[in-house]
From Swiss-Prot:
The modification 3-oxoalanine (Cys) is found at C78. The lineage of its organism: Eukaryota, Metazoa, Chordata, Craniata, Vertebrata. Residues 1-25 form the signal peptide. Disulfide bonds join C308-C419, C489-C518, C501-C507. Its cofactor is Ca(2+). Homodimer. Its EC number is 3.1.6.4. Ca(2+) binds at D38, D39, C78, D288, N289. This is N-acetylgalactosamine-6-sulfatase.
């Protein structure tokens, strides 16, 4: 069988199996539910060794499904990671990067002019071909100007915000972030959607949970396949939880937020079972990047044994918690050692729907179904970018660093530290250190904390270098970067007057447009 035909046959058999249908029946593709947390660390779940064991629902999800201990973000920051998930492509390809060398690669503050390019195929757009109804609940973060609205990029419904819940702002120098229902805003954070920074109380996770439950019920009643992208703000700083969860964790306010997330995931999975659609619903839980150690201990989580955190390309910034759950399809209680990427959720979702990925562009995401359903492992590299620079690559158990850098000495002296308590001489550098000729190579199985680079003179080092070098050369030779979306800033494009503001009396007057190159910190 030719490769294309084989792939088509695989998808067809999968869909028929998932629906419990033979060739005579009309296939019903499985529902797809992607649960994307914000800044949650690999070490925040009991199943990954968090000692207080405060995530019983997520731990049970893993026991009933499959755990991926080697699952990676496509970038150590929010927006590029989300763009990669929804396009199946590295941020350097889809435009979610900046050409300011080694910059933190953009958290898309309100003044960012760019967003998801029209020419990118976004997952819900493609799922429409298979009859899916799609909803995003929570943070979009792929551009807040009208042309970047999620309903213009394939989603049928949206409840959430275009940016993170930073604030409160005075609505003069900077507006508070709007919350949308579909096309129009229904309020703003810290106004109609209060967040008490002193106590940490906010009801947002409960609001987002109810949106998810209502959507699932409606689609089940209508007998329509659905794609739900539940991308809530928790556990991003400023960390919040609703009143019933505040003060319940041994881990402080951050732990309270994790417990509320765990409870919410439990309710979502229980609803799928109560509606008797769990065996026809694929669920995947992960995070957009590593825990923000800079915000720890009360506002940041744990990256387990890994080095550093969010904003770095060490393992703590890029390796994520990941659980796949599909009762009756994915064998329960399994662990997959497949190197996985958040970009794989794009390709895997298309495969679940019986669709092939676009053939007119490079797709970096891998179809994980062979790993999940058949235990097949695929050898593949994981590329770590920061800005427009390839910082590192993992191949098998080995990781090669071509550049190392955490944050600047200036920031470090101000108390800003992305690797608190984890100084590794020659590795966690505060200047941009190049290793392209002799990369620092670590064996992540023996040394997950990236503390002991292989000796340059060792046979092991030379063997790994021979394996890694052609992979990197081929990647760089064939790479065609997308148009950078995160270079230009303009205060006039902030959320001054979103659609629907006039109905609420919430329109604000924007300042004069003064576009300029964004000043990305180093």
């Amino acid at each position: 069988m030719a490769p294309v035909a084989a792939a088509t046959g695989w998808r067809l058999l999968l869909v028929l199996s998932a629906a419990g249908l033979g060739a005579a029946g009309a296939p019903q593709p499985p529902n797809i539910l992607l649960l994307l947390m914000d800044d949650m660390g690999w070490g925040d779940l009991g199943i990954y060794g968090e000692p207080s064991r405060e995530t019983p629902n997520l731990d049970r999800m893993a026991a009933e499904g499959m755990l991926f201990p080697s699952f990676y973000s496509a970038n150590p920051l929010c927006s590029p990671s989300r763009a990669a998930l929804l396009t199946g492509r590295l941020p350097i390809r889809n435009g979610f990067y900046t050409t300011n060398r080694h910059a933190r690669n953009a958290y898309t503050p309100q003044e960012i002019v760019g967003g998801i390019p029209d020419q990118e195929h976004v997952l819900p757009e493609l799922l429409k071909e298979a009859g899916y109804v799609s909803k995003i609940v929570g943070k979009w973060h792929l551009g807040h100007r009208p042309q970047f609205h999620p309903l213009k990029h394939g989603f049928d419904e949206w409840f959430g915000s275009p940016n993170c819940h930073f604030g409160p702002y005075d609505n003069r120098a900077r507006p508070n972030i709007p919350v949308y229902r579909d096309w129009e805003m229904v309020g703003r954070y810290y106004e109609e959607f209060p967040i008490n920074l002193k106590t940490g109380e906010a009801n947002l996770t409960q609001v987002y949970l109810q949106e998810a439950l209502d959507f699932i019920k409606r689609q089940q009643a209508a007998q329509r396949p659905f794609f739900l992208y539940w991308a809530i703000d928790a556990t991003h700083a400023p960390v919040y939880a609703s009143r019933p969860f505040l003060g319940t964790s041994q881990r402080g306010r951050y732990g309270d937020a994790v417990r509320e997330i765990d409870n919410s995931v439990g309710k979502i999975l229980s609803l799928l079972q109560d509606l008797r659609i769990s065996e026809n619903t694929f669920v995947f839980f992960t995070s957009d990047n590593g825990a923000a150690l800079i915000s720890a201990p009360n506002q940041g989580g744990s990256n387990g044994p890994f080095l550093c955190g969010k904003q770095t390309t060490f393992e703590g910034g890029m390796r994520e918690p990941a659980i796949a759950w599909w009762p009756g399809r994915i064998p329960a209680g399994r662990v997959s050692h497949q190197l996985g990427s958040i970009m794989d959720l794009f390709t895997t979702s298309l495969s679940l729907a019986g669709l092939a990925p676009p053939s007119d562009r490079v797709i970096d995401g891998l179809d994980l179904l062979p790993a999940m359903l058949g235990g097949q492992l695929t050898d593949r590299p994981i590329f770590y970018y920061r800005g427009d620079t390839l910082m590192a690559v993992t191949l098998g158990q080995y990781k090669a660093h071509f550049w190392t850098w955490t944050n600047s000495w200036e920031e470090f002296r101000q108390g800003i530290d992305f690797c608190p308590g984890q100084n590794v001489s020659g590795v966690t550098t505060h200047t941009q250190e190049e290793h392209t000729k002799l990369p620092l190579i670590f064996h992540l199985g023996r040394d997950p904390g990236e503390r002991f680079p292989l000796s340059f003179a060792s046979t092991e080092y030379l063997d790994v270098l021979q394996r890694v070098t052609p992979v990197v050369q081929q990647h760089q030779k064939t790479l065609v970067p997308g148009q950078p979306q995160l270079n230009v800033c303009d205060r006039a494009v902030m959320n001054w007057a979103p659609p629907g503001c006039e109905k609420l009396g919430k329109c604000l007057t924007p300042p004069e447009s003064t576009p300029k190159k964004c000043s990305w910190p180093h």
